């Protein structure tokens, strides 16, 4: 009866209120059969296959199911159009959420560059999960739970951070974090306000905090308007290279990773023929260090689309590179083959 109640309710909301996406809190408390049945029921509706469905692949504690929970461990049993919040991607990029001081790749954690490749491929080329398709992976670094991205970046570097103060390094690391997950396969997700360095003044869980702490501070949107523009440019750039949003389980196989000095990460991805991509291929580099780095470019002519500060260079006069380019500190640098 509980399963029937869930399915009937969700179908009603989708049909009567035209809700086009469902997020399941603590999805691991439900069983695989129920969650798959919800997906199957939605798919019977006109346009139902376009309705998003994803959730938290954990229980938040114990479970009476003991097996077949709709969690990360049973990802292979879930429909390939049921997504999960990927904490592997989150923690690889910015560091663990339960230890405020634990760094991730963007803060210089040693050895973390190995997992960045897994995150870029939505873990489709890894034995860690693995998903049926990249569309099962929700790539993100911050949500309503735990520290905001801005707070986490400051907590890693300072014993007593000034959360409302400007910080150039944190700003650059914020851009790098966004530059990684917004150029990765999967379904990108960001917390409201991440694009203007949202802070909750170091509160890890603010569900019991005041509205003043939880509100969106629109003055920060003005203060950090360049960061807002950076996110806007990355989202527009991503939309012009559809292969990054492919649901094909084999799409990440086309990624070619370069051999670079550690901890730099670089990769090339050709466009899918006929998908209307603006460039023949993407070439992307991540530099989590505090110094500039020179890197070789693949054969061809490469237009710089983003230098790690401006993500809208592709809208202006073409800056074309061949043979070599220099990466700025704490940057995600993106090139398009022309």
Which residues fall in each region the model found?
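Active-site neighborhood of glycoside hydrolase catalytic domains
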Residues: 1-63
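Conserved alpha/beta catalytic core and glycan-binding cleft of carbohydrate-active enzymes
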Residues: 39-40, 45, 49-196, 203-207, ...
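Active-site-proximal structural scaffolding
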Residues: 6, 15, 28-35, 133, ...
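A short acidic (Asp/Glu
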Residues: 32-36, 64-66, 202, 295-296
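Alpha-helical packing segments of well-folded alpha/beta enzyme cores
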Residues: 2, 6-13, 34, 140, ...
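The substrate-binding groove and active-site-proximal loops of carbohydrate-active enzymes
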Residues: 1-3, 20-30, 159-169, 215-221
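Carbohydrate-interacting/catalytic domains
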Residues: 167-171, 182-196, 200-338
